[in-house]
């Protein structure tokens, strides 16, 4: 049977960091979704299409056939920098929108990305819920925490990657994640040679950074700015709040205050190509690259995933599951005390 072109969809697409490697490898994006208007602008500037907006308003028939689903579902609900509310946060609930699309379409493969904090969030119960739902949708799932430094990007950025394949004939296929490669790139390789003076921080800002770092050190945490130079092996994680939370990566400069990274340098630290267009303000660009994925890591995973996907296969009939029932069953197992309290309240109401 003739091999067909890989078709994939790009959900919570951001600025397309997950899309780039799969297109490089011959895949075709047949649908994209991103609600942020500034990200939409960057996405359109680079891929020539405006992503669909609110994923919660999508109908099953509005999404075309696809072999692969990509989703970097919102991480703020699980991250160290956020409030860590998980599924109690509306953004955490958006994973279930992904599950709904999987239930409607059952693509052969999935690739999900989130912050490292997802692993231990709510004592591991959040990840347990995600894996349980995917398994009930007949996916054999593997996950791993990978740093951008593992694939030659000089940024210490650890993220969790969840890969799943439809379980055919109960083979229980286990995905073999790509092996790390040697970090040969240095921060200096990615820094611009000439930088506008506007990126140098003021005396007041520099004093504020130093005072905040001292305060964080007294409290025993690792927040606060970090200084790098051209010889540094890597930077810390660039965050979506790069321009306002005091945890900036700052670049040393001779005989003057340090400077912030330029948007192009942030793009390079995330592995975006030089041809990638940045049509938005610096503040929006910092936010977008801070929220994005390390493209080199996605590329390595994509190369592995393609060897597991059968592009000669025709989609088979499948039976949809009752997602509400699946989720409720797992919640009862993970949070028995909550359901016991609800039962008591119902009994008291009958008295």
UniProtKB/Swiss-Prot annotation:
Matches recorded under Gene3D superfamilies: 3.90.120.30, Vaccinia Virus protein VP39
Catalyzed chemical reaction(s): a 2'-deoxycytidine in DNA + S-adenosyl-L-methionine = a 5-methyl-2'-deoxycytidine in DNA + S-adenosyl-L-homocysteine + H(+)
Matches recorded under InterPro entries: C5-MTase, C5_DNA_meth_AS, C5_MeTfrase, C5_meth_CS, SAM-dependent_MTases_sf
Active site: 75
GO BP term (any one): methylation
PROSITE patterns referenced in this protein's UniProt entry, alphabetically: C5_MTASE_1, C5_MTASE_2, SAM_MT_C5
CDD domains according to UniProt: Cyt_C5_DNA_methylase (cd00315)
EC number: 2.1.1.37
Record GO terms (molecular function): DNA (cytosine-5-)-methyltransferase activity; DNA binding
Residues in SAM-dependent MTase C5-type domain copies: 6-312
Presence of the UniProt keyword Transferase in the record: yes
Short name of one Pfam family: DNA_methylase
Keyword line: DNA-binding, Methyltransferase, Restriction system, S-adenosyl-L-methionine, Transferase
EC class name: transferase
PANTHER family xref list: TRNA (CYTOSINE(38)-C(5))-METHYLTRANSFERASE
Similarity section: Belongs to the class I-like SAM-binding methyltransferase superfamily. C5-methyltransferase family.
The name this protein goes by in its record: Type II methyltransferase M.DsaV
Gene name per UniProt: dsaVm
């Amino acid at each position: 049977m003739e091999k067909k072109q890989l078709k994939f969809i790009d959900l919570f697409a951001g600025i397309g960091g997950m899309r780039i490697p799969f297109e490089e490898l011959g895949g075709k994006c047949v649908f994209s979704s991103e609600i942020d208007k500034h990200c939409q602008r960057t996405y359109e500037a680079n891929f020539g299409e405006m992503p669909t907006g609110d994923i919660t308003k999508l109908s099953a028939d509005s999404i075309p056939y696809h072999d692969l689903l990509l989703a970097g579902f919102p991480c703020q609900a699980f991250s160290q920098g956020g409030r860590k509310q998980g599924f109690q946060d509306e953004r955490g609930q958006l994973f279930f929108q992904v599950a709904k699309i999987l239930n409607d379409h059952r693509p052969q493969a999935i690739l999900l990305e989130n912050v490292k904090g997802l692993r231990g969030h709510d004592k591991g119960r959040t990840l347990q819920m995600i894996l349980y739902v995917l398994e009930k949708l007949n996916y054999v799932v593997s996950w791993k925490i990978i740093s951008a430094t593992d694939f030659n990007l000089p940024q210490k950025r650890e993220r969790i990657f969840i890969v799943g394949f439809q379980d055919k004939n109960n083979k229980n296929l286990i995905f073999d994640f790509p092996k790390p490669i040697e970090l040969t790139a240095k921060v200096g390789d990615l820094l611009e040679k000439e930088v506008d003076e506007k990126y140098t921080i003021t005396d007041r800002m520099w004093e504020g950074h130093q005072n905040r770092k001292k305060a964080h050190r007294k409290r025993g945490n690792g927040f606060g700015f970090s200084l790098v130079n051209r010889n540094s092996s890597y930077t810390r994680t660039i965050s979506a709040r790069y321009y306002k939370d005091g945890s900036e990566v700052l670049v040393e400069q001779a005989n003057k205050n340090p400077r912030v990274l330029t948007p192009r340098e942030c793009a390079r630290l995330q592995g975006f190509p030089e041809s990638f267009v940045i049509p938005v303000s610096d503040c929006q660009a910092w936010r977008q690259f801070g929220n994005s994925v390390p493209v080199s890591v996605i590329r390595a995973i994509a190369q592995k995933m393609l060897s597991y996907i059968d592009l000669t296969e025709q989609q088979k009939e499948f039976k949809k599951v009752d997602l509400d029932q699946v989720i409720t069953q797992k919640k009862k197992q993970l949070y028995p005390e909550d359901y016991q309290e609800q039962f008591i309240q119902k009994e008291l109401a009958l008295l």
